[in-house]
Amino acid sequence: MENTILHIHSFQLPQTEQPYPEAMLFDRDTSDSRTVLTQKPNGLEISLNFLQYDGHKGLFIRQDSRTNEPEYIEPKVLKPRNSYILFRNATSRCSQSIDPNSAFVSRVSSYIWGSGIPNPIVRRWFKYMGFFEALYHEVDYPEYIPNKLPKSPKKPKVQKGATKSKKKGAKGKNKVTALQVLVGPTVGVGGRMTVSPMTAFFSNNSHVTCYDPNFVLDTPTREFLMMPLDDITLPSQGPRSDSQEQHVPRQPPDGQDYFDILDIDDFVSPYDDLTTRSFTNRQLFKHATLG
């Protein structure tokens, strides 16, 4: 499963001036298309449709192949905190999605291993973020699911005159991170995980960083800012305090709606007033939240 991108979504999006369905995802290949997730009658699978979206009417547009006339479709809003795992092959454009609340979870393990992402890491993160209990009954190796993320390993003491070991890949070896994401000129595996409104995680097994859940991984080779897992703060639930400083992110370069290489100042707190602000699919957020 090369060139596979793993998406885990909670579908909690902010209120905007225009209707903004919770089930809407951005398709990274066409600027005016959206990936709509609709639940099948059996409640176990999700189907994918690529449709245009009319922001003024709040409806999706599907072109009728027989009459060539547009058909307006009202989006199905999924329940808050519903989470779905979507495996997408970037080469063949084929997609498969699985509801972790169903028995299909057992299949997820093989897909995760096949894409080079160690499933115990994903399971730990699911457990830590408090997702549905049904998920844990379906996975293999329940001993891999701790109640919380383990502490980072202590740094070994170095005696005077001794030289530190510089083994490649040793950094962050024992850390538990959201997903293993490999970004580089020859690597085609990417990942994204949303665990709460306006929060997403990327990880390369030793670092993790947060993005808006609408943010799309444009190419597997794009360079992203990575922050150590210890630098990610998990604030307690609740609204942002008025005494806290309001952070205003800088804007990307003229003519771009994204940053080529991200800077720490490109992140804002999710505790800004999400009900009155309008967000784009390129805005980023600094802190993880338990949602």
UniProtKB/Swiss-Prot annotation:
Outline the segment boundaries, as ranges, of region: Disordered: 148-173, 232-255
Q: Which residues bind DNA?
A: 73-144
State where the protein is found.
Answer: Nucleus
Q: Which residues form a coiled coil?
A: none
* Residue ranges, compositional bias (Basic residues): 151-173
Q: Which UniProt keywords apply?
A: Activator, DNA-binding, Nucleus, Transcription, Transcription regulation
One GO cellular component term of this record is: nucleus
The source's domain of life comes to Eukaryota
Q: Its function?
A: Mating type proteins are sequence specific DNA-binding proteins that act as master switches in yeast differentiation by controlling gene expression in a cell type-specific fashion. Transcriptional activator that induces the transcription of A cell-specific genes. Required for repression of conjugation in diploid cells.
User: What protein family is recorded?
Assistant: Belongs to the MATA2 family.
Q: What is this protein called?
A: Mating-type protein A2
Q: Which organism is it from?
A: Yarrowia lipolytica
User: What taxonomic classification does the UniProt entry list for its organism?
Assistant: Eukaryota, Fungi, Dikarya, Ascomycota, Saccharomycotina
